[in-house]
Each structure stands twice: as C-alpha cells, then as structure tokens.
Amino acid sequence: YGGRVAAKSACEQADVVDLSCATQIDFPPTSQISEIKQLNKVMQETMGVVRNENTLLNGIQTVQALTGNLPLLGMAVLKSALARKESRGAHWREDYPKSNDNDYLKTTVARFDGKQIQISFVPVPERR
C-alpha cells in the first residue's frame, strides 16, 4: 500500500509534463510465487554466514530447476561464491577459512552468455 501511495505522490509532483508513472503494482502470477519462495529458502540456507562447497553445490542444483530472472541472479551469486575459494569479509567459507590476496584480491564478475553463467575475477584498480 505504501508503495502505491508513494508512486501516486511522485506522479502528482512530477515536474515533467509528459512523464507517465505507473501507480499499479504488477505482482507475479501465482505459479511463480512458489518458485520465488523456493529460491528465497535456498538462498537463505546456502548464502548465510557460513558457507562451504557442499551447501553451495546443493543450492546450485536446486536453483537450476527454477526459471526466470531471479533464479538466474541467484545462480550468479551462488556460482560466484563457489568460485571464490577463500574467506573475505562477509563471504566466509569454512572449507577455505583464510583470505588469499594472490588469487582473490579482485572483483568477482558474473556474465551470462544466453546459455550459462561465466565467473571471472578482475583485478581491483590501485587506490591513489
């Protein structure tokens, strides 16, 4: 409800005459809601504070059965966590408890080529 009120207020106060705003929220079809709940559960179970290869692989296996953009994003997060074989900040792997600056002091990049997600690591630019 609050979102609709905010959207309506934003539309009323818009200073661009031709700006069209949607004041109705389109919720996903009921058939997708169960998949979204399943994705939510899997991500909470596998991407919590403590992670390891087995839980991440189980999460990947479950998410592979789901369709849509949200599961695709979840898959990118899971594969990124699996590829980073170290612990750093909020990413803590019990099977790799130490950080590894040599291999992973980098930004994780996930790319989707239309068929699969590719994970790579790009060096972090030096700070001046």
Task: Enumerate the language-model features and the residues they cover.
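Glycine- and aromatic-enriched mobile tails/lids
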Residues: Y1-R128
